[in-house]
Structure formats: C-alpha cells, structure tokens
C-alpha cells in the first residue's frame, strides 16, 4: 500500500511539473544569445528605431509599451529570440 501511494505521489509531481519556469532570451539588439529562467508565464521582444538604428530588447513578462514600439509576447521557451 505504501509503495502504491509513493508511486502516485511521484507520478503526480512529474505530471504537474511543479516549479516549472519559462526560459526567455534576454540579450539586447545584436548581442550574443543569452537566456534567463523566468517565473512569469511569458517572454517579450520589443523592437523600435532610434538614431542608432533598429533596437531590440528581450526579457520576461509582457510589458506595456509606448506608441511606436513593436511588442511581441509569447509563452514557450526561448520564443522571443
């Protein structure tokens, strides 16, 4: 009986994937790819143009942006690359 109970607990933990974190890219513009683990359930990629050219910012979450900034939010690992 104890073995069955232990098996059910292990299966439940594996199926629920407790403690899951999303991996988001967080490099800026044309920098080499870097990632970070995020507790948020989404990643973002912001794109805009300034006097230096096209700028890109990546990170965790889905922030509100000003007009003129393109925002893409997504919910899978490294989806904002």
From Swiss-Prot:
**Keyword field contains Membrane:** no
Q: Which domain of life is it from?
A: Eukaryota
Question: Disulfide pairs?
Answer: 24-43, 38-60, 62-73, 74-79
Which tissues show it?
A: Expressed by the venom gland.
Q: Which UniProt keywords apply?
A: Acetylcholine receptor inhibiting toxin, Disulfide bond, Ion channel impairing toxin, Neurotoxin, Postsynaptic neurotoxin, Secreted, Signal, Toxin
InterPro entries named among the record's database cross-references: Snake_3FTx, Snake_toxin-like_sf, Snake_toxin_con_site, Toxin_cobra-type
Q: Where are the transmembrane segments?
A: none
SUPFAM superfamilies associated with the record: Snake toxin-like
Which stretch is the leader sequence?
1-21
Does the record's keyword annotation contain Disulfide bond?
yes
Q: Which Gene3D superfamilies match?
A: CD59 (2.10.60.10)
Which protein family is named in the record?
Belongs to the three-finger toxin family. Short-chain subfamily. Type I alpha-neurotoxin sub-subfamily.
Q: What is this protein called?
A: Short neurotoxin B
Q: Which organism is it from?
A: Aipysurus laevis (Olive sea snake)
Taxonomic lineage: Eukaryota, Metazoa, Chordata, Craniata, Vertebrata
